[in-house]
From Swiss-Prot:
Belongs to the Mediator complex subunit 20 family. InterPro entries: Med20 (IPR016532), Mediator_Med20 (IPR013921). The lineage of its organism: Eukaryota, Fungi, Dikarya, Ascomycota, Saccharomycotina. Its main location: nucleus. The gene is SRB2. This is Mediator of RNA polymerase II transcription subunit 20.
């Protein structure tokens, strides 16, 4: 599936209720509630490589680390550095994933645990960065998504997630996350936008700041691309 994000910054309670009513009239399968945490970190300019320590006091390059922890990815955190390198971290052990409702898409293999090949963390990666890597990364923003709903349509080939976005407790808009099956064999950016235009028109989705960009159009990365879109849309 490919994804796109829309942020409606001028959404009002009336427009939000109206949009939910519109989707409900399409008789979707309700997949429950969800929330997310999106954090933005900037590199510590005083943390420089040893080989540069004799000639530089601070780093001349600014780098950014983004972490996305959606509740539907239990115990997992998507990370993106400088919008070009992505990874998904999990703190769920494989043998424990069966105990989680609906399971966990990502988990640490039992063999890794038995051989000590894990971080040994019980917390998500974004918490680890914030608590243990402060000398390297400084948190700039913590954006929250709350009150989210998940709608499944078109026999599961279309998923629409909605969420209210907050920064420091201040409402910043309505987020709409669209995930659709990509039937095109050509992974060009122009072709990726076509199915979303169809969805926007068919379901009368309000227009707003939108991103369907990907890290590499020739090699799609479902979660890396999603985190990239969050970094572009939730840039306050």
């Amino acid at each position: 599936m490919v994804s796109a994000l829309i942020l409606i910054q001028k959404a009002t309670p009336e427009t939000i209720v109206q949009f939910h009513d519109q989707l409900s009239n399409e008789l979707p399968t309700l997949k429950g509630k969800w929330s997310f945490s999106f954090k933005i970190f900037r590199n510590n300019p005083y943390s420089i490589a040893p080989e540069l320590a004799e000639t530089s006091v601070t780093s001349s390059e600014s780098k950014f680390l983004y972490t996305l922890a959606p509740s539907y990815l239990v115990g997992s955190c998507i990370s993106l550095i400088n919008k070009n390198s992505a990874c998904v971290f999990s703190n769920v052990i494989e043998e424990e994933s069966a105990e989680i409702s609906n399971g966990s898409e990502f988990s640490i293999p039992d063999s890794h645990l038995h051989q000590g090949a894990t971080t040994g963390l019980n917390d998500t990666f974004d918490f680890f960065v914030n608590q243990k890597m402060q000398s390297l990364w400084t948190q700039k923003q913590n954006i929250k998504g709350d009150g989210g709903q998940i709608y499944e349509l078109e026999n599961g080939s279309l998923i629409i997630r909605t969420s209210n976005v907050f920064l420091h407790g201040i409402f910043k808009g309505l987020l709409i996350q669209i995930e659709v099956e990509n039937e095109s064999s050509e992974h060009e950016t122009s072709s990726l936008s076509e199915p979303f235009e169809r969805v926007l028109s068919k379901y009368n989705i309000p227009r707003g700041k939108m991103s369907c960009n990907v890290l590499d159009s020739k090699l799609l990365d479902k979660y890396g691309d999603l985190c990239l879109q969050y970094s572009e849309i939730l840039n306050f």
